[in-house]
Amino acid sequence: MKLFIAEKPSVAQAIADVLGGGKKANGFIDLPNLSTKITWCYGHLLEQEQPEYYVDGGKVLAEHLPVIPDRFKLSPREKAAAQVKVIKDLLKEADEVVNAGDADREGQLLVDELFPVLAWKGKTSRIWLSSLDEESVRLALLKVKPNDQ
């Protein structure tokens, strides 16, 4: 199954419309005839853990500052936990993921930051959408590139 992860629901819907509509489900759009599902983010779904997470005992004191861990831990934002679970479950079914974040660095990061947290290591591609009109989406879908380009 091919899974598109869009930056927001309106982008997911624009992609689905060009691909034939699909059926809305809880947190994604299913296009079974194409073996494709489209899900979305709502801005950044993850956030860095608070400083207390990194300090033994969980209480930050002056002597702990600044708190700079070797690696920052990202966790789902409270309001985004349900959508993160939807994406995690869909990734388990996916053979390929298409990053459909906005055509800028932030759009790239917004989707890419999910992959290590949700343990996705499979094939990942990227489309660049400059507009959501039908012709722009159709052209973007014809120009799928590797995610690292």
Feature roles, as predicted:
Residues 1-149:
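Intrinsically disordered, low-complexity regulatory segments
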